[in-house]
């Protein structure tokens, strides 16, 4: 399968992108040149998604929120992806040593600390810049004083080096590294309680949408990225005032919208430039 397209970049420059998926793997091209990694393609074409399951960003564990945070960090600081690749490699080596109870566990600590602290600093910088956008978005969408707090993945009273030493015996017992940015989270709280414990499914969706909207507005202002936003079944879990809040916030975004739905909800965001219909597995213009 091959998908190609043309995007408008900085200063109204145009660039062609392409992705081809075969049995042997996935390849990508940017302006006719092979992309060495899919991260290059992702950086060239920023896409975010709001779909019916977006409430899981609030409801489920830290993995989803780390991915949400890192998506924005990568676009503001492109070198972040290299840090994460290095960290993942070192973490894998340390965990392998823990599983075999090898005496080389501590050999990996210095690298883990150095790269882990760099990742944490990048995430904290992003969160500081994001918070004003978050506060405006969550107020407009939910009307609730929901708070975001970055939890770095180890005790605030310890450096990462100290945490690794303190948890060494426990790490050996569990055979995995328990401190570091891979254990980080973004706590979502309302009046000091976990938002997932007090918000309805519809409210969780609006909070998760606010997290996404805040990201997009930050990227537009900070690095002049004009993202594409994919909306799938936007009215799911929403009705009345909540749906109107959602429509108002999304309509204010200065980005391309692609809306998919079984119902004519795309009209809620204004007259679409193009409309297509899926029929018998084929996409046809209307």
Q: Where do the protein language model's features map onto the residues?
A:
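Conserved short hydrophobic beta-strand within the ABC ATPase nucleotide-binding domain
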Residues: 273-276
